[in-house]
Amino acid sequence: MKCFERLVLAHLKTCLPPTLDPFQFAYRKNRSKEDAISTALHSALSHLDNNNSYVRMLFIDFSSAFNTVIPSKLITKLSHLGINTSLCNWILDFLSNRPQSVRVENHTSSTLILNTGVPQGCVLSPLLYSLFTYDCTPVHGSNTIVKFADDTTVIGLISDNDESAYREEVQHLAVWCADNNLALNTKKTKELIVDFRKKAGTHIPIHINGMEVERVASFKFLGVHISEDLSWTLNTSSLVKKAHQRLFFLRRLKKAHLSPQILENFYRCTIESILTNCRSNLL
């Protein structure tokens, strides 16, 4: 089945219009996680060059995002994107009436029929989710919504202490989530404020669905630690610590007299990959 899904995936990509949201970086040709991080940081840094300005970054957390997609809504959006009816009907049939059961050793639960969500581990699911959220775009030009699969970040560029556009954007996003059956987890949603002004005032917290969003000094965004001073100290320390821990295993392998080729492969896969992760953002 996965082989056929790959064929459908390749065909679906050729049917997509070039006008898709440019700030969705997952599962798009010539786009990557590094591009999403660079875009977010460039947007913030460029704005901070202006007088009396600061940036609020809201890192949205969804509860089981893939499991809450409503197939009928997805098909409607695919139709708006110009996907032909035959392909839409196939996708709807693929996502509907899916039997599911749980097996533990020799015991199997009763079968449950699912009509909501895109199955995790499915070849098509990541792209289908990205297309489901294609219309999650900012309503104000002073805001940017950066998306990478189900990781969504609202970047509010604030000038002269006027946060009205940013706060309206957050409320608009909350309404969009409710309309699209996505459960916005306010407890795990975090906000980071970058304010280099000498006389920065007190920042009023953001509330979503009546619950206050926690403000943090740093946040791990797509694997990279971003701090409120926009320095790389925390991220670098974290990478070095992680690499140092894995060096212990490399030493153990060396003591076991494994071949240099195996040791080199282990180093490149488990240590060098950490140190070079998102290195373009550090340059």
Indicate residue ranges for each PLM-predicted region.
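Mobile genetic element proteins and their domesticated derivatives, centered on retroelements
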Residues: 8, 12, 40, 61, ...
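Conserved pre-catalytic core of RNA-dependent polymerases
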Residues: 1-118, 156
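Active-site palm subdomain of RNA-directed nucleic acid polymerases
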Residues: 8-24, 126-155
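Short, conserved micro-motifs composed of acidic
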Residues: 158, 171, 183-217
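Secondary-structure capping and boundary motifs in well-ordered enzyme cores
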Residues: 1-4, 29-36, 66, 116-125, ...
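Inter-domain linker/hinge segments that demarcate the starts of reverse transcriptase
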Residues: 7-12, 36-47, 163-180, 244
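Non-catalytic, peripheral interaction segments enriched in hydrophobic/basic residues
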Residues: 148-149, 178-202, 223-283
